[in-house]
Regions:
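Solvent-exposed beta-strand/loop surfaces, strongest in extracytoplasmic domains of secreted
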Residues: 1-133
Length: 133
């Protein structure tokens, strides 16, 4: 019996999938996994944060000397880091506040700041006297 156990994998949202690898036990007579197995693993479809099963795919034996036992595992997609940095603003005492704006970095997969931040806006600490807020 040839035992194949998929390795657990992780990736950050928006990054490329890691190689899906596995461990093999039960080889006999100097056989190697590369000479006994063909094909590769695949995973459940999805790119959002979550857990996706790693499946046997088309991994198969090319030797009649073994039976294959496969144990799957998971690919976990974790959240990406999104950086939001407020732009520095100034105003003259007594004038209206300027528009508060920000810069965003770390967006992935074609996401936009408006969609990810749900149209969020900035606010400032209350105060009108001369100073830093």
């Amino acid at each position: 019996l040839l035992n194949v156990i998929a390795d657990a994998k992780t990736k950050v949202y928006g990054d490329a999938d890691p190689s899906l690898t596995y461990q093999v036990s039960g080889l006999k007579n100097g056989d190697t996994a590369g000479s006994i197995l063909t094909g590769g693993l695949n995973r459940a479809t999805g790119e959002n944060v979550g857990v996706y099963g790693i499946n046997q795919g088309d991994l198969a034996l090319n030797s009649g000397n073994y039976d294959l036992s496969y144990q799957g595992n998971n690919l976990t997609i974790t959240k990406a880091l999104l950086n939001v940095i407020a732009d520095a603003k100034t105003k003259v005492y007594g004038d209206a506040d300027p528009s508060l704006t920000y810069q965003v970095s770390g967006l992935k997969n074609g996401d936009t700041a408006g969609a990810v931040l749900n149209g969020g806006s900035l606010s400032r600490v209350a105060g009108e006297n001369v100073g830093v807020y």
